[in-house]
Amino acid sequence: MSSTWNNNIGFTVFGESHGPAIGVVMDNVPPGESINLDKIYQFMARRAPKQNKTSTQRKEKDMPQIMSGYFNGKTTGTPLCALIANTDQHSQDYSNLSRLARPGHADYTGALRYRGFNDVRGGGHFSGRLTAPLCFAGAVAGQILEKRGIYVGAHIAEIHGIKDKAFDPINTTKDMIREVREKEFPTIIDVQGNEMIKEIDKARKDKDSVGGIIECIAINVPAGIGSPIFDGLENSIAQLIFGIPAVKGLEFGAGFKVAEMTGSENNDEFYVNDKGHVVTKTNNHGGILGGIASGMPITLRVAFKPTPSIARPQATVDYSAMKNETLEVKGRHDPCVVPRAVPCVEAAVNIALLNHMLEYPNF
């Protein structure tokens, strides 16, 4: 099933944007792990719509109701299931979409895949709304990892060409990660964040949208976790990252810049530091070699396309009658999904790392 990620951690998301609820089931979560529900709510609140000009005006509390797998503040080891109610749907905004394909959306391809029976309201199962259960699962995984000293953080690296400072690929600390995490608009340099907000608001006023890039870092990941070929760390992270709607690109470490380098420029030279650990002088490899963690920070950048729902007239087709039409999308939509996607990227990386950590000796 395409909505199930089944590895050491089993992870299934279900529901549609305008159905009664969405949810998640996690299998093989270690028993006896203390989970702080307030921290889960805080994590999910970072993904929820903000009451400002940078996000949709759809208002969802995103309060998960845990149905199983959690008792007396701890995981039980049985399937961990959470439901999240949908409470603010405007389904009438989508009344004509059973036959008109929104450019940039999965309406047309979804109709082909599911023979026209797919729920198109709000994007249905393809909606960014499904990142709420992803964030629940990622918040659980993140708490388990942080108890082992592993911290994952992300920030908005770029919005429509306006760039933030990058994480230090060698010396980023958990305090630096927490500082960015606590910001309403998560950039390292606040001045750049303010410029990004202006750019998003400009797109909104122009009845348009913009995309951007999120940078993510994971620190204190033990050297040696992961696998070669098909089950590598990059593979697992990539599968989950591309489960986030609107993601169109992913790079690790120096990424596509390595194509412009020589071997002597790209290679990260090893040495033994003052703590007796094998480390590298640089981190072009992004903390992963051969699908296996090197012990250096894992770094990645994720590209998000502009929100496809824009209020401008666009050419499309009525695929029930096979004729050309013009569509002006109605509804409440983000002029830029990137700010709300920051915890989604963290969640995906948390789940992937926990999945591989379960193979680690003395977990």
Residue ranges and their predicted role:
Residues S98-G124, A315-H333:
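Short acidic, glycine/tyrosine-flanked loop/strand segments centered on an H-E-D-like triad
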Residues P20-G32, G128-Y151, D231-Q239, M296-T307, ...:
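Alpha-helical support elements that line or immediately flank enzyme active sites
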Residues G10, T307-F363:
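Internal helix-turn-beta structural module
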Residues M44-P103, D107-T109:
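Glycine-rich, N-terminal phosphate-binding loop and its surrounding beta-alpha-beta segment
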